[in-house]
Amino acid sequence: MLRFGITTRITQANGYEESRDSLAHDWGDFFTREFPKDIWASIPNIGNDAVRYFQSLSLNVLIISGGDSIGETPKRDETEYALLEYALKNRIPIIAICRGMQLVHSYFGGKIIKGDEEFSSIHRAKMHEIITEENDIFSINSYHNDLILEDNLHSDLKIIARCTKDFTVEAFVNHSLIGLMWHPERAMVDSKWSNEIIKNFLKNYHD
């Protein structure tokens, strides 16, 4: 059985002073639909202690979720870097989504670049096409302001998809992780293909 642990973003609720850890309801729908026989748990932003929390629940897959940019919420950064390092050292499969993919890129020494107005016109709350290494074209959703360039990518990370318009990196893999710049939990044209990428990664990892 897969036991997913998924990180959360830090948000402010209207009318309340304290910060909250939150996760879009889309993720609950995603797990129910795509992994109905498996279980999942959200991970609070508690810094390095998140590793002990992950262990205490016997989780065996890490999802680093999207939302916001690296550096905006230091406690979340600390939490996710600690979990990422733990998962890499212990060969726990990692699925990194949007900001999560950027976090992986940063961990491996890559530079996160802020997109300009032209970039945002393609990638900010849009649908656009990507091309895979097999030259297949798919339509995905896009919600990010930051970008990853191929010439700044660590050699351990293999590109598997690029944007057809500006050729920025949209997905990469290595032996223990997959990074997707789009949001598989949200609606898009080629969601079936996107979900199969994740399932095949997990299947190959555990075979």
Predicted regions and their residues:
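Active-site-proximal beta-strand elements of phosphoester/diester hydrolases
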Residues: 139-140, 178-183
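The feature captures the conserved acid-bearing segment of alpha/beta-hydrolase catalytic domains
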Residues: 143-150, 169
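N-terminal beta1-alpha1 cap of cysteine-dependent amidohydrolase-like domains
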Residues: 1-99, 106-107, 113, 118-126, ...
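Short, proline-enriched alpha-helix->beta-strand connector loops that line the catalytic pocket
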Residues: 143, 153-155, 175-176
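Short, surface-exposed beta-strand/loop micro-motifs that present aromatic residues
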Residues: 166-174, 178
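Glycine-centered loop/turn positions within well-structured domains
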Residues: 102, 110, 146, 178
